[in-house]
């Protein structure tokens, strides 16, 4: 052995050791999942009819998102936020009424369905989704797109007057296209389901 050590080979006989580092238990992780629902309402109505048009599938989509979180043993539902929007069609005052009350109708539906505490769900509303409207026009190939966008960006115009001028500028056919292809998508309810993922323990 001394002879080997003198030749620099003694290290071969040293026992190798592997150090095992114990991981720290992870802290709680905060997560969120988002979605959008496009509920249908009869004209000027604020009550949700679950069987009306596509409401069955849209409500199921919301429930599926919530259920995914609720049914996972590693997660805890901490809150739900709902943000409702109306389209610019009609007066701003009426659209404010619709956006506010339709948002509340969805809050009431979710609260009632799951028997949630009222404090679990928060909500807000936007009277008219002009941001979505502008994105639609900007991405379109409408003949008077630039003029319509200029009108949209004019902050000096009364909101109702602006909508009327856009309708006049677009013309009957183009405005009909906007009513059918754009406005329905601007009536939406965005929802965020917040939850925590518990940290693992060392046995896991």
Annotate the PLM regions:
Residues 2-13:
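Single conserved hydrophobic/aromatic residue that forms the stacking wall/gate
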Residues 38-42, 79-83, 122, 188-194:
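Soluble periplasmic/extracytoplasmic beta-strand elements of cell-envelope proteins
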Residues 87-191:
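Periplasmic OmpA-like peptidoglycan-binding domain that tethers envelope proteins to the cell wall
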Residues 19-32, 41, 46-83, 87-88, ...:
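Periplasmic peptidoglycan-binding/anchoring modules of Gram-negative envelope and division proteins
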Residues 59, 71-73, 107-108, 180-181, ...:
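Mobile acidic interaction elements
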Residues 198-200:
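Extended amphipathic alpha-helical interaction segments
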């Amino acid at each position: 052995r001394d002879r080997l050590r003198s030749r620099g080979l003694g290290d071969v006989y040293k026992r190798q050791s592997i150090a095992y580092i114990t991981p720290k238990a992870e802290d709680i992780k905060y997560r969120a999942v988002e979605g959008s629902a496009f509920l249908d309402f009869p004209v000027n109505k604020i009550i949700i009819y679950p069987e009306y048009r596509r409401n069955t599938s849209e409500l199921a989509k919301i429930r599926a998102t919530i259920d995914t979180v609720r049914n996972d043993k590693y997660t805890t539902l901490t809150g739900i936020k709902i943000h409702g929007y109306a389209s610019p069609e009609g007066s701003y005052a009426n659209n404010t009424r619709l956006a506010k009350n339709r948002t509340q109708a969805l809050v009431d539906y979710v609260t009632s369905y799951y028997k949630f505490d009222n404090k679990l769900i928060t909500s807000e509303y936007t009277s008219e989704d002009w941001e979505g409207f502008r994105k639609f026009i900007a991405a379109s190939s409408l003949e008077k797109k630039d003029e319509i966008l200029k009108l949209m960006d004019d902050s000096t115009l009364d909101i109702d007057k602006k909508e009327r001028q856009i309708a006049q500028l677009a013309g009957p056919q183009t405005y009909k296209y906007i009513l059918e292809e754009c406005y329905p998508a601007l009536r939406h309810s965005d929802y965020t389901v917040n939850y925590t993922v518990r940290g693992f323990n060392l046995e896991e």
